[in-house]
Amino acid sequence: MFRRRTTAPEMEQADPTAVAAAASIGKLLMKKGNQSDNEQRPTYRSASMTNLRKPSAPKRMSSISSISSESRRSDGKGRPGKINSLTQRSSMGKGDSLNSPLTKEPQHKTRSHNRTSSLPNQRGQQSRNSSGLQRQKSKTHQRISYDEAQRTFKDFGGPQARGILTGQHRTENPSGSIPLRTTRKYIPGPNGLVAIEVPVEKPSNANTSKLLRRSNSAHSALNARNGSLLRKKVSQESLHSQPKKTSSLGNTSSTQAKKGQKAVQERNLAKKHPINSNVPLIETQVREETDQELKLDNSNSSESETVVNSENNLEKPSSLNIEKDDLSKLIHENIELESFIEEKGKEKPLNSDQEDVFISEKTVKGDVQWPKNNRQASTLEKTFNYDNEEKREGNKPVAEHPLPEAEVDDKSVEQLNNISSSGSYSAQGSVENSKPENGNKNLENDTTSSPTQDLDEKSRSIEEKDTLEGTESSKKVEKPDNCCEKISGANTSSKKGNVGDTKDEFFDTVEESDQKTSKSNSSKNTDHSNQTEPTPSLAQYLRTSNTYLSRKNQSKQAEQEKFHKPEAPMVPVTKVVTPIKSALKKSSGSSNHDSSMYSDNSPANGAYLSLTTAENTRLNAQMTMSDSVSRRASLKRSSIKRPQSVGQFRSIRSNSPSPPEKINNKRHSAIPLGTPEKGKPKRNSVMASLSKNSQQIQEPASVYESNGPNKPKNQINKNIKRGSQIAQNNKPSTKDMNSILYPKEPPPRKSSFEKTRSNESHLGFKKLSLRNGNFEEALSESYNGQASQNSTNVNRTDTAQEFFKYLGHSSRFADSDSEDESQFFNQGPSKYNTETEGNKTSGNKNSNGGNGAFSLFKSKSKQKENNVVSPGVSSPNHTTTDPAITSKKVDKKFSGLSLRAASEAEPAKNSNPSMTNRLRFSSNPENGESRLPQAQEVSVTKEKKGSFGKKLKKIFGRKK
């Protein structure tokens, strides 16, 4: 845009003679050419002004054919003025066209400036180019299109229109006498095609001109739509031009709606008249624009002079002229509004006889009846009617609640004052403000009084209401008075200064007033809702608060009564529901011991947890005998490694459980430890005793810290006697053992992670495998009902050999004929004789001391499973030839330990004692074949028995 203004001095060269020449050429070449040069000049002036006023750039952007079609469509509309100016410029610019193509570049500059410059510049250019009327014609068409393009560029603020309209110069150039200058090459721009002048032959130009006209018309339509929107948003000229369009022409919407039709008509015109279609269309546009622009010139006689004076800057005079028109229109509108308001104020019925309570209602009605306030009247109707309804509903005697009325009056005054702040409604607002107050005082003053008078009347009427309603409302009335003063000052300034105000100021005031009115209406709606409702809402709130307090107390008492009743059972319920106790305790012992040992804060809680874990492990062992046997084997192994004193210490503690342990014994053991066994001397099921004894064995290990050696010695003796009686009655026979030890089918191995493990490395891992679980279950079940214990050592060794034939397989793939058997049964016994004899003493001591229970417990499992890993020591129980002696000894040893261990001593007797000893002390199952003489074993057991008693005397200071 700076570039165009720099080219302004070239555009100043145009003279009115060129305008006259262009007009004469237009007359000769146009079908309807009957206009004189004098007629064209004012039309051209008005056209330039209308171009500045109107945002319809598409016509400027479009080709001359499109301009002509638009002018035909828009008869009596504001756009043809623009188009007429273009046509006049084209006729005037026809004289501008020089013979040399070098002059075309300054012509572009002059064209661009002609778009921005005033009429005398274009006239000077035309006078400069008076020679060559036909050349002038062609170049004036180009100039017109280019000028329109630059006008749209100026209006739009972008170069999009320049290329399109310059592209239309091609279509215009072939109409001229010089084809080289008329045609241009189009280069695509960001918003359209940019034209570059290229000499082209006439026929090719004619063909391309049609196509380019079509494309340019399409681009012009698009750019017109976009440009009109941009103008309305961006440029101040759009703000100046929009009111003129609406006021003088009122064709903004219609012209934009017809853009698509214009493009089609432009195409048709270009087809019919590729060369001369532009000229007659231009002349018709001139006539249309002259009619409309002459009317505009009558209202704005000084517009052309201001434009002529400002050659380089057209924005200022155009804005001033437009502002003058707008201000004059606003003045007329304000005068009309004032007259109308005066008539209405006089016609209003003056009802001052009614009470003051209803005066505000009358003011509301008067406010509602104002018709000129299109938006604001509707909003006021809604707000005031809503307020009146709330008043009537919430406060039937309105005098009882004076504050809401005063507030409504104040708000009505504020809303009216806010309405009066708008420029067009400035006079109306002041008169409207005076209306309700004068109605209260028998409107005798003129409604056209100054806003200061209105303020006085308002203050008087409000003071009267205040005397009736209360002094509190006076404070609130002062604020609306101040608002009225401010707004009235704005109204007076708007009335007086409308003539001198610029158009930008007018729009700013209008926008601000609209925003203020909208904000005031919204805020007042909220204020009315907040201020009219508070009396019922306050009363309701106080009532609800009182009722809430009373009801709340009642409800709280009722709830407390309801909850106090279940609170007594709730405490134990919550304790029972705790996951540990509910899952682990299955008896009513918790209810008996809530306060002492089973409470969460009791010191026995840790002991209880340990016992419950032990019981759970026992129950899991009962579910699968394989698991129980494996646990027994592991316990047996660990018991041998522990020192004797520790084992004895634990055995004694196992006989004296803590209070929760006693409860568990009552719970889970059929024979409680605290009661004598005389009533129950015999048992048919050894498994029950085994399971219960395993419980008793496993519990003291977990409760070792919590239990103390506080139990008397007599109880231990009772337990020993008890276990001896049970063991004597439950000794299995060798025949049953033979049936057990010869299974029909070896069960398949269930885990294969040990298949590459050597027999020496089995240790306790083979015990942990499930390969022999089925056999162990059968073995444990076979003990039920077995009573005889007479057997020979040969039978024991045979059964043991057959038993180990089955158990000797190191992997599932090993057969009964595998090498493992030969190694298992054929290795020399001499190696382990010394080991067994040397270790039986310690093993038996451990078995007597309390780990003996674990050792026997595990020796059974070894005989059942594999007898490979045998840390247990139960040989003295097995090696007695006389069953009575063995039963007595075993009963003395294991009566206080566990029923399971006591019952396991008898089946162990049927097996080879040397095998048990070997397997007990050797990790290699193959070495278990070596046997000890029975006499040696008997002597060893006797020695161990004596040594065990001595050690018990040393530890506990008592004799057995």
From Swiss-Prot:
The annotated topology with respect to the bilayer is: Peripheral membrane protein
Q: Which GO terms of the cellular component aspect does the record hold?
A: cell periphery; cytoplasm; eisosome; plasma membrane
Q: Tell me the segments the record calls region Disordered.
A: 30-185, 206-318, 363-607, 619-760, 812-960
Key word Membrane present: yes
Example GO BP: eisosome assembly
Report the residues modified as Phosphoserine: S48, S220, S235, S238, S319, S339, S352, S434, S461, S630, S758, S816, S818, S855
Bias category Polar residues: which stretches? 33-53, 84-102, 115-135, 206-226, 236-258, 371-386, 431-453, 531-557, 619-628, 641-656, 686-708, 725-737, 823-836, 866-884, 909-927
State the UniProt keywords alphabetically.
Cell membrane, Membrane, Phosphoprotein
Q: Where is the composition biased (Low complexity)?
A: 298-312, 420-430, 587-602, 709-718, 839-848
What residues bear Phosphothreonine in this entry? T467, T675
The UniProt regions of compositional bias labelled Basic and acidic residues, in chain numbering, are: 144-154, 285-296, 388-413, 455-484, 558-567, 746-760
Feature: compositional bias, Basic residues: 947-960
Compartments where located:
Cell membrane
| Entry superkingdom | Eukaryota
Function text: Important for the biogenesis of eisosomes, large cytoplasmic protein assemblies that localize to specialized domains on the plasma membrane to cluster specific proteins at sites of membrane invaginations. Required for efficient incorporation of the eisosome component PIL1 into eisosomes.
| Subunit and interaction comment | Component of eisosomes, large cytoplasmic protein assemblies that localize to specialized domains termed MCCs on the plasma membrane.
Family of this protein: Belongs to the SEG1 family.
Name of this chain's protein: Eisosome protein SEG1
Q: Which gene encodes it?
A: SEG1
